[in-house]
Each structure stands twice: as structure tokens, then as C-alpha cells.
């Protein structure tokens, strides 16, 4: 099912305190590298000590403050599960479901003995199909699994009528995610492509196919996915909400794409035809190309694609040998990790992925005090006031557009900590007599049925959460005009209750400002106060915005992240605008909060310096070269170093705080500095 279009921060938040309630700087001196000059490389100055003292763990391709907090959250979740598995519970209770599912996730000995038995009946059924029509019937029978289907579907808010859900159809079918992996010809990408072919063949062998058959099937999968890549939009092109909104009727879909059995697949999934009479086709050109591809492919190709779907959806839940082969490619080859996480971590993450809200409810009771929620609400209000002031400060904007922007800001729907409505898991059955894989599929079926029941032909539920409470992240969703800060991010080290306002506004404050700014970035600005994809800008103001936004895209595209690789400033534009806006809004809020009682110097730094050091400290990390290449293709966020060294040179207050002057490496002349929000 389709996930809502949301804009996560990949950054963390915590609760605020009054400006004069703390007295520590919040800084850890050993995290700094005072041999570096802040005006030449602020990232190294602010995080160099941390990088040196925290070498990259073997199980990670990137490790920083964000991952440290995720580790802490994972340990808390694991403590809940370890406590649950010590007891026996009445069948059907949420405790029984969590406990038994966790035990299944931990029981690798059982999975090794079972081998591929849990998926063998499905593979045999596919193998027995004699014709393309037989295979297509199986696609309908197992429609929820999307066997060999190269596009995605699901319900979400109609972006031009956001009170109602609508059926969505969008491009898909690429194991590697980004089309660049199939089409780019630089040495690093070519090496990954060759490794991918070997990996696919190996996986087919591990699922019982002969070496010769595995090689043939792998080639069919690779050629098919390459053909899909050639007709797919790029990650950057997918960021244009207007271009990816194309409403059509089911009748029109059938006329346009006669070889795609969409209605039969939807019916097989449990969706009645009445709920797909109108839909949004995100990428019509892709669907047209896919229609031709699927018409031309023979039965053996479709069979290989369906088998590959089974392999891909089950590889994390079967034997150690299969898991290790999967890790060797995605972990080592793609990202540069040296080893996988231990069993307890993998098991904890798997339970969290399938029954996250059930765990989240327990998590919040144990680890999230109500006082934190109230304090966070206060800080969010402070940041809203500040963003309003920043809107008024944009001299290039007309009064008319500013008024509309204020209206949108005033209507932000703020979610903090945990949802008002918890998921009811009573219809989910976890059966310990069945395999781990079968129980995972039961969880997927439960979620699928729940989404259809709650969204097909139904109004949008604004109280739905798109992250679990224990998630270490935050997001903005334009169709509900909401900002969300789950309980998982409201903890140290991104907030220090004993530190003063400079530290906390520099860390948590920027996080909040970042999410708010997403409502006014290059994508978010296209949605109105109600969340509809509707233009509320004057033509002149829209031109002024785009002119400024283009300068950000160009600036970041000129950054070399590796000697042979530039950043993609157009792909990361929304996040770069949100980082800059978050800094501007939070710094302004910080100055508001301390206007009557300025903070003293602490640990050798002024209050303004501590604000920027706190922000930079959030992004201290170590990362492999392979992961850098991977993220440039797949991650709409700039790399940690450039969320610091790319953002700060455009903020006048940073120059003033650290005495940055002409001749310093990070200096940009004032008339060339970028400003938006």
C-alpha cells in the first residue's frame, strides 16, 4: 500500500525549557576539534572530536548522533520484548502476540531447519503454471504480495480534494530503488550492477533452483528491471507534485493500458471495483511503457519475476544462509557495512516493523512522561511565532501572499509523542505453530486489510500517524498540513534538560523549524492551508521564490561529496531549504526567548556560538564511501557534513558569531548569500 507523501527530518527533537531554567552549555568539549578553524571547516571544528572518538562500527555504513539515539530507542524496545517473552499469556492478547512473534524472530535454529519450506508451496504453484494466463491468475490470487507486478498501488489523500482518500497507481519494480543504478555508467555503479546480477543468481540457487536455471532467471530479472528503469522518472522528477498528479477513471485506465489487469488485481487484494472508479496515476508515461513491456514478455520471464518477488519478500525471514547472502549484497556491496547486526537487534527491529504501534503504546507508558509533551507544545508555539516573523521579513513577498502564508502557518496540525487513536490488533493472529515467515505475512495481510477497510471510499483520518511513537524521526505531511514529533525523538542527546536555551534551540529548535519550513519549501508551498494542491501565490511571488530556490539547487549541486561525485542539489532542494529555514526560524526564536535576559559565555563560547555548535553537533557522523554514493542516489537529504558546511555560510548570524571574514575558506560575500525564510 502506498505511504503518504511525507517529509521526514532524519533529525531529532526534545522538550523545551524556559530560557533561564538551565545553566550548562550542553556542549561536550571532547566532541570538538579545536585544531580546526571554524571559519574554514565548521563541521570539523564542531564534530571532529566526536568522529575521532566514535569510529564507524562494523555493522554500520553510517554512524552518528542520529544512530546513537536510534540505538538507545532500540534497547528500550528490546527491554520491553525481553520482559514480555518471560511469561505466557492468554491467546489473542496483545502481550501474547508480541511475545510469540518476538520468540519466532529469535528462533534462528528453527528457521535454519525449515529452510525454504515456508515459501515452497507458493514457488511450486508458480512453477506448475504452464501459460502466461495461468501465471496472471496467480498474480490475482496473491495480489496482496504483488508477485511480478512492476507498479505500486494504495489509498491516500486526493491531493486536490484532501478530505477524501483515492486510489493511487505509481511506478515501481526496481529492486535497487533508483533508476540510476541500472543506467549510469560510472565505474562504481557498473560494479554494483555486476554484483547485483551475481546476487540475484545466487539467491535463486539458495531457493532451490539449479545454477543454470538461476543464471537464466537472474538475466531475465535484470533485463526486465533495466527496461523499467528506462521508462521510470528519476527521484528528482518524482518531487514535482503537479506533474505526478494525473486523475483518470478506471475506464480511461483500461483504454490507456489494456494489458494491465488493474481491476482484477485490486479485486484480488480485496478492493471492490466501486472504490477504484477514479484514481490518480502518478506517472502515465511509465504505465504506458509498462503496458507494452508486460504485453511483450513471455511466460518464462513473468515466472522468473514472480519467483523473484517471493525471494525478495521472504529473504529476511528464512535461513541464516539466505539472510547472509542478502546482507553481502545490500549491506556490504551497496553500503560498505562489514557485518550484520546481532540477532537480538534484528529480531527487535522485525517486531517493531510489523507491530510497531502495539510496541509504541507500551513504550510511551514506560518512557514518555506527559510533562515532555506539554513542554514540547510550548516550544512549537514559540517556533510558530518566529516563523510568522520570518514570513513578514521576506521583503520580496507581497502582502497578499504573506497573508496566505500566515493562514497556512496558523492551521498547522501539531502531533507530539503518540497518536490519539491506537491501532486495534484484535483481528491479527500470531500463531507460534506456524513459521516466522507465515506470521510476517499475517501481519502484512492485517495491515493491508486495515488500510482497505479504513480508506477505500472513506474520508481522510487526520489523526492517522505515519510513524510509530518510538520512531527516531519527525515529519511534515502537506495534505494534512501537519508536523509530527514522535516520542522516540524526544530524548537526549538532542535535548539536554540541564543545558540553556542556546543549546536546545540549536538542536531541537532547528528540528521543529525544519519541519515547519517544509510547509513552505519548493514542494510544500504548492499546498494550501487545508492541504490541497492549489496555488495560493501571486505570479510575481512564485517567480521570486523559484529564482531563490534555484540558487540553492545550483549551490548544492556544485558541492563535491567525493572527488568524482557531486551532490544533487535539485534532488535535495526541499531538505536544504528546510535546513536553512529551520536555522533562521530557530535562531530568531532563540533571540526572542533571551531578549530580556541575554545568556552568558560558557565553556569559552558565546550563546550564539553555542547555538550553531549545537546544530552542527547533531550531524557528527562517520560514513563509508559506498554509503555516500548510495545516499546521493536515494536520499533527498544532503550528507551530514553539508547540512552544516552547506547551510551555515548563508546565515549572517553565523558570520557574526565566529568572526568569519573575507579570506576564510567558508566565506561567501554577503551579496551572494542565499536567503529564503
Protein language model features and the residues they cover:
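Bacterial Sec-dependent N-terminal signal peptides
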Residues: 1-22
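Short, solvent-exposed loop/turn and secondary-structure capping segments
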Residues: 29, 53-57, 153-156, 178-180, ...
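Hydrophobic/aromatic-rich, well-ordered segments within soluble, folded domains that form packed cores
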Residues: 31-52, 182, 186-205, 399, ...
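Active-site-surrounding "flap" and adjacent substrate/cofactor-binding loops of secreted or lumenal enzymes
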Residues: 37-40, 45-110
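Short secondary-structure subsegments characteristic of cysteine-rich extracellular domains
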Residues: 59-81, 214-231, 504-510, 608-612
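Intrinsically disordered, low-complexity linker/terminal regions across diverse proteins
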Residues: 70, 256-259, 280-284, 341, ...
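Short, Gly/Pro- and small/polar-rich lid/capping loops
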Residues: 22-30
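Noncatalytic, helix-rich "gating/capping" subdomain that lines the substrate-entry/channel surface
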Residues: 84-378, 382
Amino acid at each position: 500500500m502506498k505511504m503518504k507523501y511525507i517529509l521526514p527530518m532524519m533529525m531529532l527533537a526534545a522538550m523545551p525549557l524556559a530560557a533561564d531554567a538551565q545553566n550548562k552549555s550542553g556542549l561536550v568539549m571532547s566532541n570538538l576539534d579545536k585544531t580546526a578553524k571554524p571559519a574554514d571547516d565548521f563541521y570539523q571544528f564542531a564534530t571532529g572530536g566526536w568522529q575521532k572518538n566514535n569510529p564507524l562500527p562494523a555493522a554500520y555504513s553510517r554512524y552518528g548522533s542520529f544512530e546513537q539515539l536510534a540505538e538507545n530507542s532500540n534497547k528500550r524496545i528490546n527491554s520491553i520484548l525481553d520482559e514480555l517473552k518471560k511469561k505466557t499469556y492468554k491467546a489473542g492478547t496483545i502481550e501474547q502476540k508480541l511475545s510469540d512473534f518476538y520468540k519466532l524472530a529469535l528462533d534462528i535454529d528453527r528457521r535454519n531447519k525449515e529452510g525454504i519450506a515456508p515459501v515452497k508451496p507458493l514457488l511450486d504453484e508458480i512453477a506448475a503454471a504452464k501459460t502466461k494466463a495461468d501465471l496472471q491468475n496467480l498474480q490475482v490470487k496473491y495480489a496482496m504480495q504483488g508477485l511480478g507486478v512492476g507498479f505500486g498501488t494504495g489509498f491516500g489523500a486526493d491531493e486536490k480534494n484532501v478530505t477524501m482518500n483515492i486510489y493511487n497507481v505509481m511506478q515501481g519494480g526496481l529492486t535497487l530503488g533508483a533508476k540510476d543504478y541500472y543506467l549510469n555508467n560510472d565505474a562504481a555503479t557498473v560494479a554494483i550492477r555486476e554484483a547485483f546480477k551475481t546476487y540475484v543468481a545466487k539467491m535463486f540457487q539458495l531457493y532451490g533452483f539449479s545454477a543454470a536455471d538461476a543464471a537464466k532467471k537472474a538475466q531475465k530479472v535484470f533485463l526486465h528491471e533495466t527496461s523499467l528503469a528506462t521508462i521510470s522518472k528519476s527521484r528528482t522528477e518524482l518531487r514535482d507534485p503537479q506533474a505526478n498528479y494525473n486523475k483518470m477513471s478506471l475506464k480511461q485506465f483500461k483504454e490507456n493500458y489494456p494489458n494491465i489487469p488493474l481491476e482484477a488485481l485490486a479485486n484480488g487484494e480485496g478492493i471492490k471495483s466501486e472504490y477504484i472508479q477514479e484514481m490518480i496515476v502518478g506517472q502515465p508515461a511509465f504505465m504506458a511503457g509498462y503496458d507494452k513491456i508486460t504485453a511483450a514478455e513471455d511466460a518464462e520471464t513473468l515466472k522468473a519475476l514472480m519467483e523473484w518477488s517471493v525471494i525478495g519478500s521472504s529473504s529476511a525471514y528464512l535461513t541464516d544462509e539466505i539472510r547472509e547472502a542478502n546482507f553481502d549484497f545490500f549491506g556490504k556491496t551497496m553500503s560498505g557495512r562489514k557485518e550484520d547486526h546481532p540477532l537480538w537487534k534484528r529480531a527487535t527491529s522485525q517486531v517493531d516493523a510489523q507491530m510497531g504501534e502495539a510496541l509504541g503504546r507500551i513504550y510511551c507508558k514506560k518512557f514518555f512522561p506527559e510533562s515532555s509533551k506539554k513542554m514540547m507544545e510550548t516550544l512549537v508555539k514559540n517556533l510558530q511565532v518566529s516563523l510568522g516573523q520570518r514570513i513578514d521579513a521576506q521583503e520580496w513577498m507581497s502582502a497578499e501572499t504573506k497573508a496566505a502564508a500566515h493562514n497556512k502557518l496558523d492551521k498547522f496540525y501539531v502531533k507530539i509523542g503518540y497518536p490519539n487513536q491506537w491501532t486495534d490488533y484484535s483481528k491479527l493472529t500470531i500463531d507460534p505453530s506456524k513459521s516466522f515467515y507465515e506470521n510476517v505475512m499475517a501481519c502484512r495481510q492485517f495491515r493491508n486489510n486495515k488500510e482497505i477497510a479504513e480508506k477505500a471510499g472513506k474520508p481522510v483520518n487526520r489523526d492517522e500517524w505515519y510513524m510509530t511513537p518510538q520512531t527516531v524521526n519527525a515529519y511534515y505531511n502537506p495534505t494534512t498540513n501537519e508536523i509530527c514529533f514522535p516520542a522516540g525523538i524526544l530524548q537526549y542527546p538532542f535535548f539536554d534538560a540541564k543545558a540553556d536555551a542556546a543549546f536546545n534551540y540549536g538542536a531541537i529548535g532547528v528540528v521543529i523549524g525544519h519541519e515547519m519550513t517544509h510547509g513552505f519549501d519548493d514542494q510544500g508551498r504548492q499546498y494550501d492551508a487545508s492541504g490541497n494542491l492549489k496555488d495560493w501565490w501571486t505570479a510575481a511571488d512564485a517567480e521570486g521564490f523559484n529564482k531563490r530556490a534555484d540558487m540553492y539547487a545550483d549551490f548544492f549541486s556544485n558541492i563535491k561529496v567525493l572527488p568524482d561525485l557531486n551532490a544533487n542539489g535539485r534532488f535535495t532542494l526541499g531538505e536544504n531549504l528546510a535546513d536553512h529555514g529551520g536555522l533562521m526560524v530557530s535562531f530568531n526564536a532563540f533571540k526572542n526567548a533571551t531578549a530580556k535576559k541575554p545568556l552568558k559565555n560558557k565553556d569559552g563560547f558565546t550563546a550564539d556560538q553555542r547555538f550553531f555548535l549545537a546544530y552542527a553537533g547533531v550531524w557528527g557522523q562517520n560514513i563509508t564511501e559506498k554509503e555516500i554514493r548510495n545516499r546521493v542516489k536515494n536520499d533527498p537529504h544532503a550528507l551530514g557534513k553539508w547540512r552544516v558546511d552547506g547551510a551555515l555560510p548563508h546565515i549572517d548570524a553565523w558570520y557574526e558569531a565566529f568572526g568569519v571574514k573575507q579570506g576564510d575558506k567558508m566565506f561567501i560575500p554577503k551579496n551572494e548569500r542565499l536567503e529564503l525564510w
